Amino acid sequence: CTAVAQTPSAYFMEGSTFRSQLNPAFAPLRGYVNIPVLGGVQVNVSGNLSVSDIFYPVNGSLVTLFDKNVSAAEALGNLRSKNMLGTDARINIVGFGAFRKDHKTFWSFDLNMRVEAEANMPYSLFDFLKNGRNEAVINDIKASTQAYLEAAFSYSFPLTDQIYLGARGKFLVGAGRARTSIDRLDIKLQENSWNIDADGSFEMSGLEMSSMQRPDGSEYYSFNDFDVSSYKGPAGYGFAVDLGVTYDVIPDLQLSFAVNDLGFISWGKKYLERGQMTKSQSFTGVEIIDGEVHDPEFDFGELEFDRVQASKGKTEMLRTSINLG
């Protein structure tokens, strides 16, 4: 469970129907019916990496920090030991709400599509890729994404003349998820091959992923041969709540606080694909002629994960966010 502070502009737009998504204690000025999809699309980006750390202007166009026209000193100068980047998107499919007869109590229903992704990339990874080093020790590479449907019912009401409370209950249907974690990756360039010693794992739910087979009959996954043959339908179910409060200090000054996405999704084992990487591997294709390395690029897609039979599903907490205003 990770707490993330958010400051989207809609939070401070009084009367916005989307505002109540950020704090269930907020009520719009009137009832509403959202236009499907167009009724509300929100995208948030968080982390300690900025766009300017990844993309650089070169000759009138944007290139990544790995481009040869961007020096290593410039590309790596703004990076940290741990570089984190996360994004989440909410697309409102159906939304409507109304005041009760007292015009103080408000209720609403929303059906949203939620997509979340995050990654943790250590400095040593960027250093290895940018400088083309012949060996490296890289720890703690993580990447994840998940998508789910959210059916939410909200209710807000005045507790006193100054305090307004709101709560939202949400039933969640997991569409799919993927997690990759490489805890340790020792890489060394030998005479004509890359040798690695690695410890990592990956999981995927909701999609049927084809595995490869070795001559000895064992099965493995490789991202270069990544083949998702079909979508198997809902892969998990869960529940979450949002809680919010507002306090009118004076007529033109209001304080607010909300905690969103307190909940979980339980992903079943039926559509769970799992791989484990705990041994040394060697990739050929590197040529050394007269002491000079040719075709030295390391291909992360060549990493092999041994297929592991899932014995049980997995329950994961949502990424909790806190909004203050």
Q: Where would I find each of the regions flagged by the language model?
A:
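C-terminal segment of classical bacterial N-terminal signal peptides
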Residues: C1-V4
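Subset of outer-membrane beta-barrel
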Residues: Q6-G325
